[in-house]
Design a protein with these regions (language model features):
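Active-site neighborhood of HAD-like aspartate-dependent phosphohydrolases
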Residues: 11-59
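Non-transmembrane alpha-helical segments in soluble domains
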Residues: 31, 35, 74, 100-104
Length: 114
């Protein structure tokens, strides 16, 4: 694994490794949004209840906030044709489209790199 400072030292783009960045809790503050949606602690709320509340929160995925420091990370990695990784949940049928909307609204990742 390379440290981000090691990537800066590379002079030739062909020498760079692929960069993969997670979405939830790396770029996007999922837990903060989930806590707000359930009106308390997401992890301490009954599983069915918490997902029902998220399902009922219009635009939940598309309107999540950036994680602290995530814009700085994003601005660094986007220069290197980075990939974003994220899973969608079957507990919320809007999660996939919502995450794609968030990425489209807030980033310039190539569609192929998502």
């Amino acid at each position: 694994m390379k440290y981000i400072t090691q990537l800066e030292k590379k002079s030739n783009d062909t020498e760079l490794p692929s960069i993969y960045c997670d979405l939830d809790q790396v770029l996007v503050a999922f837990m903060k949004g989930a806590d707000a949606a359930v009106g308390g602690s997401f992890v301490q709320t009954d599983k069915d209840e918490r997902w029902n509340k998220i399902n009922q929160t219009r635009g939940f995925w598309a309107n999540l906030e950036w994680m602290a420091g995530a814009k700085r990370l994003y601005n660094f990695i986007i220069r290197y044709d980075a990939y974003v990784l994220s899973a969608y949940t079957r507990k919320d049928p809007t999660s996939r489209n919502g995450k794609m909307k968030w990425l489209s609204k807030n980033t310039k990742f190539k569609k192929f790199n998502i």
